[in-house]
Amino acid sequence: EKGWGVFGVELFVLTDGSVLFNEVSPRPHDTGMVTMASQRLSEFALHARAILGLPITQEHVALSIPDGAVAASHAIVIQGDGEAEFRNVANALSQPGTDLRIFAKPEVHGHRRMAVALAIGTDEADARAKAENVAESLEIDIA
């Protein structure tokens, strides 16, 4: 069948170099949220344009970060049972070039990805370090 829009493909690269397939989802995947920091239109906006039959040009997929800059994301996975409360957000986002997307998931039971930290850096290591710093600076309570 023919499909329109974004298909998220999740693969795992093991330490021995082998690749394992995990899933294909006919929608944007949260691991692609880095596009909200790096591109003019995110994967979510591009998905909407595709399924609505709207044109997608080079202008739509253009990067929105300075030449040579790199974007990175860091998933925030919470373990527990109850509602998650995010605190210390302003401090976590005090470094320029950082952002945080908290998902509208009402509660966590076990392990659940609840947010993603986004960052722009001068290189991959810088962007990753900034995103990790945002995640580590958050205070998360489970009630």
Q: Where do the protein language model's features map onto the residues?
A:
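Short acidic-glycine loop/turn motifs at beta-strand connectors
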Residues: 14-17, 121-123
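Peripheral (often C-terminal) accessory segments that flank ATP-dependent C-N-forming ligase machineries
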Residues: 49-143
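Active-site "cap" helix and flanking loop/linker of ATP-utilizing ligase/carboxylase catalytic domains
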Residues: 1-9, 15, 25-82
